[in-house]
A protein has these predicted regions:
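Structural signature of the two symmetry-related core transmembrane helices
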Residues: 76-89, 270-284, 366
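A late C-terminal transmembrane helix in Major Facilitator Superfamily
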Residues: 325-353
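Intracellular juxtamembrane helix-capping segments at the cytosolic ends
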Residues: 113-126, 308-322
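Helix-loop boundary and gating motifs at the non-cytosolic
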Residues: 5-54, 209-212, 220-230, 234, ...
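C-terminal transmembrane helical hairpin of 12-TM major facilitator-type secondary transporters
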Residues: 269-311
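Helix-to-loop junctions at the C-terminal end of transmembrane segments
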Residues: 60-72, 157, 255-267, 353
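Symmetry-related core transmembrane helices of the 12-TM Major Facilitator Superfamily/SLC fold
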Residues: 164-180, 362-377
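Cytoplasmic helix-loop-helix junction between adjacent transmembrane helices
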Residues: 105-140
Length: 391
């Protein structure tokens, strides 16, 4: 019973802390962008500034497992909330753009640590029979914060120090909630003898999971950066082309929880294969977009939803197989493969649209989904052989 109470308390702390932190962060991001623009910084400069967040995430990802071993998951989680709060205070105390750049980079590293440790904690604390649904609910909540943060900024306004005060208050609430994590969460004093698992070790331990994460990142995150260009190429105006991003986000938010529920009841490997087959089929259907542009709306919804569902299935699978520092290690590599998919999709898709406007997009993403299916099936076959050999 004490273990169940501790797990429930851990879930409440992880959900509430992450909710307040991300609402604050997604309010802070457009606030900084608008403030820099008002101060005369050009679009390219603002773009480079924004990229510092992703650079911070990319750099901290391979270090997350080591940090969790050194500090323990509980204090790593707390640190990932405290650093953005300190950075937000720094934005108020100084106007120097180079200081803002440093602070935003550090905030990006903290958000990457929160992403990895937070999802690992949720997967670890969730009861096994409900793990898929709880992980899916957590990721749906994260998607909702993308919309709430900018919405709060619209209500508060962008002038003066008031919006920064609201951001600081939200981040402080997140830190306070993180302190509620139970002391039974692993500290830095136990399991430290377990060696850190590098990228190769994690890939060998769960290749099918990492393959699913990579394909999910391509279709959920990667396509987001390409959708406005795709919309313009099939005749949409600027507003409609931009709205495709919202539709993709809605698809992702809507399908993550059902995907988690399916993961609780059925074989997760088979679900991942079915999702990848559906991505392959929908990519083939995109060949009709030049003639029937209206198909973009359901297709984009499906791509965002299936990509997010693949990532959910992958995280649930890791939560079922690993615990403690080992889970943080594998979650970090899953985030790396997911992010890599998100990074590769926009430039590759842009090249395809430039050089073959009518069929290039379809050919590229059909090829990606097909290769993803082959990788997934091959990884599952190797894992089955390994399990048979171990038996």
């Amino acid at each position: 019973m004490p273990g169940a109470v501790s797990s429930t308390r851990g879930l409440v702390a992880a959900f509430s802390s992450t909710f307040f932190e991300l609402v604050g962060f997604f309010m802070l991001l457009p606030l900084l962008q608008l403030t820099l623009t008002a101060r005369g910084v050009g679009a390219s400069g603002v773009g480079l500034f924004t990229a510092l967040d992703w650079l911070g995430i990319f750099i901290v990802t391979p270090l997350a497992g080591r940090l969790a071993r050194f500090l323990g998951e509980r204090w790593s989680f707390w640190l990932s909330g405290a650093l953005p709060l300190v950075c937000a205070l720094g934005f108020v105390l100084t106007d120097a753009i180079w200081w803002w750049s440093v602070l935003f980079f550090v905030a990006g590293m903290a958000s990457g640590l929160r992403w990895i440790v937070g999802e690992a904690l949720v997967a670890q604390c969730a009861p096994e029979r409900y793990r898929g649904r709880i992980v899916g609910l957590f990721q749906t909540m994260i998607g909702v914060t993308f919309m709430i943060g900018p919405g709060v900024l619209v209500l508060v306004g962008t002038q003066g120090t008031q919006p920064f005060v609201v951001v600081i208050a939200l981040l402080a609430l997140g830190v306070a909630c993180s302190l509620a994590l139970p002391a039974t969460m692993r500290s830095a004093t136990d399991e430290d003898h377990v060696p850190h698992a590098g990228v190769r070790t994690a890939l060998r331990a769960a290749p099918s999971v990492m393959a699913a994460g990579f394909v999910g990142g391509l279709f959920e995150v990667g396509l987001t950066g390409l959708l406005p260009v795709l919309g313009l190429s099939i005749g949409f105006d600027n507003a409609a082309a931009t709205l495709l991003i919202t539709v993709s986000g809605i698809g992702s938010a809507v399908l993550m929880l059902p995907a988690g529920a399916l993961a609780d009841r059925f074989d997760r490997n088979r679900i991942a294969v079915v999702l990848t087959v559906l991505l392959l089929a929908s990519s083939l259907v995109s060949a009709a977009l030049p003639d029937w542009p209206w198909l973009a709306w359901p297709l984009v919804f499906v791509w965002g939803g299936l990509g997010g569902a693949l990532y959910t299935i992958a995280m649930v699978s890791l939560g079922m197989r690993f615990r403690g520092p080992a889970l943080v290690d594998r979650a970090a590599v899953l985030v790396m493969t997911y992010t890599l998919g998100g990074i590769l999709a926009p430039p590759l898709g842009g090249l395809a649209l430039d050089y073959a406007p009518r069929w290039g997009f379809t050919a590229l993403f059909t090829l990606i989904a097909g290769l993803g299916l082959v990788l997934l099936l091959g990884a599952l076959r190797r894992e089955a052989r390994g399990n048979a050999g171990a038996a």
